[in-house]
Regions:
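Cytosolic regulatory regions of ion transport systems
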Residues: 1-196
Length: 196
């Protein structure tokens, strides 16, 4: 059940809450609760997919140290040429020994971006056990989302299908709403699309 609380609402153990606010306000809120985590500086990505290229560019733009692991030698070569400041490792990202050698335990964030949902989920669960870092797994089938986030092993799941459909729906609704009201600047969907 999704509830948008009023002043009479009481939070109970086991309730999940979703917050929307500016980054500054969220940071202040989590600091007051002693739940603030420092921003990730070291990021490990397994899988040199097209999504990896975009993510690495964004991470480099904000001065993050990035390690990318992929089993495809050509992709590794291309990635290292395109991003000279990134540590690119040619190897099996599912190899626990390799992950250990590349200091998975020292990472602030781990992102599984291989082409296989199952591999991404297992890698993310492994990273979660090895480290208390932020863990993200990419999945193509949204039916795996609940499995991936079960028992808190994976922090975030990115579903390519839902991101694409959500982007299209947001654009269409924003266009529709811009004709009806000038007060709406951006429309976002939360809680699996149950709240806008």
């Amino acid at each position: 059940e999704t509830i948008i609380p009023t002043g009479m609402f009481t939070l109970r153990a086991g309730d999940k809450i979703y917050l929307t606010a500016s980054a500054r306000d969220l940071e202040s809120f989590f600091r007051k609760l002693n739940l603030f985590k420092a921003k990730a500086s070291n990021v490990m990505i397994v899988g040199a997919s097209r999504m990896t290229y975009y993510l690495v560019k964004e991470l480099q733009d904000i001065q993050k140290r990035v390690t990318v692991i992929d089993s495809d030698a050509a992709r590794c070569q291309e990635m290292s040429e395109k991003f000279p400041g990134v540590l690119v490792i040619h190897g099996d990202g599912a190899d626990a020994e390799l992950l250990s050698e590349e200091r998975i335990t020292e990472m602030d964030a781990f992102v599984a971006l291989t082409g296989l949902d199952e591999t991404n989920i297992i890698l993310a669960m492994y990273a979660s056990q090895m480290n208390s870092c932020k863990v993200v797994a990419k999945i193509n089938r949204s039916s795996f989302a609940d499995l991936a986030t079960a028992k808190g092993m994976v922090d975030s799941v990115v579903s390519t299908a839902s991101v694409t459909s959500e982007s299209i729906a947001m654009y269409v609704r924003a266009m529709q709403n811009s004709f009806e009201s000038e007060n709406i600047k951006t429309l976002h969907r939360l809680v699996g699309g149950r709240v806008e």
